[in-house]
Amino acid sequence: MLPKYYQNLPYNGKRIFEKFYDRSLQKYKSTQIATKLACCAVRKKYMLIDGKWQPRPDANNSDTTTSTEDSTTDTETEYSTTEDELA
């Protein structure tokens, strides 16, 4: 489930990915959409610097833990993913 590009995420980053992936898969019934939304959610909290995932300085300004159904829509437009990230 976790794309190769995201394998070395910190524990909390992996939890964010899994949570968004599972919720998006249930909602949209598409693994491609679920993966893209989960990647976007991770990138709201972490950035890759010199091959290591680091928390964003502004990571606490975005909440990835809301319980509303529409919480994934914020992540759809803010970050785009590349084909390498989804592989």
From Swiss-Prot:
Q: Provide ranges: composition bias, Acidic residues.
A: 71-87
Q: Which domain of life is it from?
A: Viruses
What protein name applies here? Uncharacterized 10.1 kDa protein in LEF8-FP intergenic region
Q: Which Pfam families match?
A: ChaB (PF06150)
Chain residue ranges for the region called Disordered: 52-87
Q: Which Gene3D superfamilies match?
A: ChaB
